[in-house]
């Protein structure tokens, strides 16, 4: 039997100020010790691709909660932002912390078919990884401190390995940059083609290819600063919403009768 666990309110911060998404009820099918419901407060952090999350984010036995809301604002927000199947909304809880690390706790809200669900990010495995990395660094530090002149060959081998790792890292960085640019081009192309279809512009029309190309080039020029930073290795990405708004604006301009 489902039971209401709590109600979540979280804040969105934007150019026009803050907006609070209210009355998100979290329900569970699992029995819980507490019979009272609480109210959680949170802050929107970012959107994520669920398919690209690290394996440690979700454990196999973690609870997934159903989300409901009677708020028209909340319903409209989730409908707009969770149209993509693999998209998730990361919320940092203001009044709840991870018991092990005493760091902020996080919820990820996502849509599964027609249902709205959420789960709390499991930081247990991450802490284990961090502990192992710290231990390994300490052991490496002790080993380096005890290296003598007779062990100089080990230093030479280590330096050679570090150079190889540096080369691999540079290759990986270039591949990552190319992937981001390719993703930008693919998303931009789909948005333009979709926008042309919505306007009833068929590819049989004489100026179809010309309209597609000038829209593509103009969108690239609009986001030239972001693309330049991406080419320099920045982790920045051009958001889907920003690119969609650019394409819509350009198509309205170019298709005026």
Curated annotation (Swiss-Prot):
It holds the Pfam family Sld7_N. Disulfide bonds: none annotated. GO terms for cellular component: cytoplasm; nucleus; spindle pole. It is found in: Nucleus; Cytoplasm, Cytoskeleton, Spindle pole. Keywords: Cell cycle, Cytoplasm, Cytoskeleton, DNA replication, Nucleus. The keyword Flavoprotein does not apply. One of its GO terms (biological process) is regulation of DNA-templated DNA replication initiation. Belongs to the SLD7 family. Interacts with SLD3. Required for the proper function of SLD3 at the initiation of DNA replication. Binds to SLD3 and reduces its affinity for CDC45, a component of the replication fork. Required for mitochondrial morphology. This is Mitochondrial morphogenesis protein SLD7. It comes from Saccharomyces cerevisiae (strain Lalvin QA23). The lineage of its organism: Eukaryota, Fungi, Dikarya, Ascomycota, Saccharomycotina. The gene is SLD7.
């Amino acid at each position: 039997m489902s039971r209401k666990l709590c109600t979540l309110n979280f804040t969105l911060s934007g150019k026009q100020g803050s907006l609070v998404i209210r009355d998100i009820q979290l329900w569970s099918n699992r029995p819980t010790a507490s019979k009272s419901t609480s109210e959680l407060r949170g802050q929107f952090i970012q959107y994520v691709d669920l398919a690209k999350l690290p394996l440690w984010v979700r454990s196999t036995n973690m609870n997934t909660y159903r989300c409901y809301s009677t708020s028209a604002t909340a319903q409209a927000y989730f409908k707009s932002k969770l149209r993509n199947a693999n998209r998730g909304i990361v919320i940092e809880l203001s009044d709840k912390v991870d018991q092990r690390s005493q760091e902020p706790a996080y919820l990820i809200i996502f849509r599964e078919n027609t249902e709205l669900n959420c789960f709390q990010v499991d930081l247990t495995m991450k802490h284990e990884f961090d502990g192992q990395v710290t231990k390994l660094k300490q052991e490496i530090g002790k080993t380096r401190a005890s290296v003598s002149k007779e062990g100089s060959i080990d230093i030479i081998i280590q330096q050679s390995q570090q150079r190889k790792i540096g080369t691999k890292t540079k290759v990986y960085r270039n591949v990552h940059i190319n992937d981001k640019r390719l993703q930008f081009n693919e998303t931009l192309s789909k948005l333009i083609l979709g926008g042309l279809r919505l306007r009833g512009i068929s590819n049989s029309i004489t100026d179809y290819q010309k309209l597609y190309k000038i829209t593509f080039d103009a969108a690239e020029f609009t986001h030239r600063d972001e693309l330049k930073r991406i080419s320099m290795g920045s982790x920045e990405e051009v958001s889907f919403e920003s690119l969609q708004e650019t394409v819509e604006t350009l198509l309205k301009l170019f298709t005026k009768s």
